[in-house]
Amino acid sequence: TESEIGVDWPWGNHTNGLTWRWIISPNIVAKTFLASSRYRYDFDFYFDNKETYIDNDSTIHNDFAFDIVYKDIIKDRTLETEIIWKANDRHTITGGFQRKDINFDLSNEYIITTLDTTFTSKPLDMKNRTRELAAYVQDKWDVSDKIKFQGGLRLAHYNLHDKVYVEPRIGMKYNISSDMSFKMNWGRYHQFLITANDPDENFRLIDLWMGLPEDKPASVSDHAILGFEYFSPKNILYRVETYYKDFNHLLSLKQGDVYAENEGEVQSTPFNEFWDTDAYAYGLELLVKKTSGKFKGWVGYTLAKTFYYTPPNGWFSPNHDRVHTLNVVTTVELPNWVSDNLEMNAAITGSSGNPYTPIIGRANEWEQEIRGGRANYPGAPSEMNWFSSNKYLVDKKNSDRYPSYFRLDIGITRKNRRLFKWRYDSYIQIINVTNHENALSYLHRTRTDQSTGNRGVVERAPLNMFPFMI
């Protein structure tokens, strides 16, 4: 017997770019950017088992192999040209053009091979080529020493849609004083790239990207931002921003029945069926940042709310929604009497738990199947069979949240060390110092009586993120 099992997993991207900057005159500068990139995700899990039996004068060979292949290859060719014209002391006009040619090759394949038979199933095989064209113009206008205005217009075209998308943008900044300002921005944006990932996945190794299908409208969003900034004499930045974002025609992947627990069945989600999804988000962001001196760092707090709407679920909070998030990052240069060039750092992250759909019970489902009779076997009697399966009962989508998230990391860095003529920094980092258990997901099982085989209540255990690590 010979067995072979393995994974072939080339994954990564590379980009080649060329930039040409041309000073046409003291007031006009042109910049052209040409880029070619390839993103590649090619996962192949394979198993091959060869057996040989020798019995007296006969030899029997048996061969069984299977392959599971996921492939996502994206090739992008981009050309951008931008011209900046300093018209006068108060107006700076920018205009440009962009062209993106993208080839998508997305597939999923199952291959089963025996000694004399090969079975191939390809539930996903999508190849398409898209082209995005855009032209834009923008004017930065210094209305006065205190008021600055920026207005622009972008026109976008997607080759699979027979229309031109109009994207206006406006912004204004009012300098209350030399170190204090108020700003506002509004803009409309379209997107022609989508992901074919299960929206309920909390962890994924890769995003499967694809171009917007011809029969789907482009995703559109309107962003509005209001902000206030103050830069203190002690080189500390204080910033407050509030925002509102409205989304239409987001595409959410339709899910298979992920809560079924039928033995011997594979629950799958199609890669090319989507719900037309609406959404909106609003929030408040606070930032205090110090970038100079022996003690540096920043403190950021975010209050955010996000809601999605799909036909089967109504309005709900998506998996990535976190209402409260606090981040504290500090760096301290220790005095020379402790040690030369020694720096300590710490990072604290705390947030509300992410939403999830809770399982509230379990039920049995029965299905009826009729075999035989005149339609299938003329003259044979009909047979009626019943099949039972188990299914979890769930509450409303994302109606509960995981426990709050907390993590403290600390580290020490020794800078400007020397090895022969080379300089380097050495560091040690401790992750999750308090070993706080942060749930990534929950694992469920049905309690079973081993003596009778009867199935009882549903049990739950957390699948945690990073533990204490050095």
Which ranges hold each PLM region?
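Face-selective signature of the C-terminal outer-membrane beta-barrel domain
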Residues: 10-161, 236-239, 298
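Short loop/turn motifs that connect adjacent beta-strands in outer-membrane beta-barrel proteins
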Residues: 25-29, 86-90, 143-146, 179, ...
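Transmembrane beta-barrel strands of outer-membrane/channel proteins
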Residues: 32-38, 95-101, 151-155, 184-188, ...
